[in-house]
Amino acid sequence: MDKRISIAIDGPAAAGKSTVAKVVAKKLSYVYIDTGAMYRTITYAALEQKVDIENEEKLMEVVKNVNIEFQQGENTQLVFLNGQDVSEVIRTPDVTNRVSIVAKHRLVREEMVRRQQGLAKKGGVVMDGRDIGTHVLPDAEVKIFMLASVEERAERRHLENMNKGFDSNLEQLREEIARRDKLDSEREVSPLKKADDALELDTTSLSIEEVVQKIMGIVSGVFAK
């Protein structure tokens, strides 16, 4: 497996992309790039500075002054904002409920895509997000589009919130996930969309291990060519 390829994993909110992408990256000894964490970091920075996230011009002032770095922790990936560890605070419901608004802005996405492509230049990456296969890494050798029902995704996020000690309401989560799906799918710039050459994977009734196994099978097929 000397060949180092790029793997793009796309899908809607709470489809399990990050969890699966991390495991796949670890198995391959690849770099994992969580593009969602980048948008979350921008969102967190804007909220901290009390910037109107609907105002693209003001948001870009935040973006220009934000340096985002990833470091591998013991069991997880750490995210740093200008040297500060923000790995936990960017996962709070406040950030989660606003990140799709930040991500809809054209100039913000263009800058994030530029940074993401820079990180992926040498290959050997697993990147997950909403527009990786269609826009960020259109030439990725493996493209996966992960799906799961709103109900399943709400239950996963509810469990995740409870485990982190966040207040969580299942019905509210269903509504928020459906709203994020709508925002992500209907935005003008790089909407959530399956790439024509992506393989669709419905994870509703699959465990993380089963999803990882399927993706590793696809990757092995590419290495065998």
Curated annotation (Swiss-Prot):
Species the sequence originates in: Bacillus mycoides (strain KBAB4)
Subcellular location: Cytoplasm
SUPFAM superfamilies registered for this protein in UniProt: P-loop containing nucleoside triphosphate hydrolases
UniProt keyword Cytoplasm, yes or no: yes
Enzyme Commission numbers on file: 2.7.4.25
Single GO BP term: nucleobase-containing small molecule interconversion
Class of enzymatic activity (EC top level): transferase
Recorded name of the encoding gene: cmk
UniProt xrefs under NCBIfam families: cmk
InterPro entries: Cytidylate_kin (IPR003136), Cytidylate_kinase_dom (IPR011994), P-loop_NTPase (IPR027417)
CDD domains: CMPK (cd02020)
A molecular function GO annotation: ATP binding
Origin: domain of life: Bacteria
GO cellular component, one term: cytosol
Keyword Transport carried by entry: no
Binding site for ATP: G11, P12, A13, A14, A15, G16, K17, S18, T19
Record keywords, A-Z: ATP-binding, Cytoplasm, Kinase, Nucleotide-binding, Transferase
Family: Belongs to the cytidylate kinase family. Type 1 subfamily.
Catalytic activity: CMP + ATP = CDP + ADP; dCMP + ATP = dCDP + ADP
Protein name: Cytidylate kinase
